């Protein structure tokens, strides 16, 4: 059974007290310290469990299934051991999940918008990534980013986030591996058909960046990660642009597209 990316990490937390970080990009390389300025680490007392994307100084976008009590967000992080001087930590002030989301369907509208308790400042390692101006095209070059396990089964945690290059695939290429996916889920399929590069458990909520734009949110995938014919599934950000812009503008009663 395919698993929501964060659930695999929660199981690991139960099995091993020492390994508390989230899982992440399989088949990647160490990210450059300056290439993930919009990446947000979402964490609690057990460690990182999800990621998010800073879209302006006061708002973060992540997956709805990352919602949890008592979490914080870290901005400008790279190494877990060596702090950047410009790292900043914020709490959520308000959280918005689509009011028309089906609560018993984890794949439906897997997106959450978070207002910070205070704005963050742009710095050498912190900068927002704006919402996409147009939908992505099949075949686009995409980048995935995250902290955690760099192996799909035996957990191996790196100190810094890893990155990998993948491609946006046609939905028809994903359908055989995910017969449960429905068009109304508003998702993107991205990865390598032959496998080997993928996001993984705990990478949930992090960005899929295609041609320099924030197009997807890590949501769903096969387990183990990186299987052939089971690319990653990402919430399609563009379809929720109007909802997010309405919330940010103050219309907190706005609903998501059906």
UniProtKB/Swiss-Prot annotation:
Residues 25-249 form the Peptidase S1 domain. Residues 1-18 form the signal peptide. The keyword Protease applies. The keyword Transmembrane helix does not apply. The active site is at 65 (charge relay system), 110 (charge relay system), 204 (charge relay system). Its main location: secreted. Monomer. This is Beta-fibrinogenase stejnefibrase-2. It comes from Trimeresurus stejnegeri (Chinese green tree viper).
């Amino acid at each position: 059974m395919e698993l929501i990316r964060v659930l695999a990490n929660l199981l690991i937390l139960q099995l091993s007290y020492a390994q508390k970080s989230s899982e992440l990009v399989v088949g990647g390389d160490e990210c450059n310290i300056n290439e993930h300025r919009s990446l947000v680490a979402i964490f609690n007392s057990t460690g990182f469990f999800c990621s998010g994307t800073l879209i302006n100084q006061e708002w973060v976008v992540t997956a709805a299934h990352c919602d949890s009590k008592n979490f914080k967000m870290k901005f400008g992080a790279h190494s877990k051991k060596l702090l950047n001087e410009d790292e900043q930590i914020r709490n959520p002030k308000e959280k918005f999940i689509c009011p028309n989301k089906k609560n018993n369907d984890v794949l439906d509208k897997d997106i959450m918008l978070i207002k910070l308790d205070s704005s963050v400042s742009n710095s050498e390692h912190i900068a927002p990534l704006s919402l996409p101006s147009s939908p992505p095209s099949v075949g686009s070059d995409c980048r995935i980013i995250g902290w955690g396990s760099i192996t799909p089964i035996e957990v191996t945690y790196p100190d810094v986030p890893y990155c990998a290059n993948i491609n946006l695939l046609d939905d028809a290429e994903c359908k055989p591996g995910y017969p449960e996916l429905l068009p109304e889920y508003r998702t993107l399929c991205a990865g390598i058909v032959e496998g080997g590069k993928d996001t993984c458990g705990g990478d949930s909520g992090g960005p899929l960046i295609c041609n320099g734009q924030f197009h997807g949110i890590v949501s769903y995938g096969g387990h183990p990660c990186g299987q052939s014919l089971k690319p990653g599934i990402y919430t399609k950000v563009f379809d929720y642009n109007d909802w997010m812009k309405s919330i940010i503008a103050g219309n907190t009663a706005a609903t998501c597209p059906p």
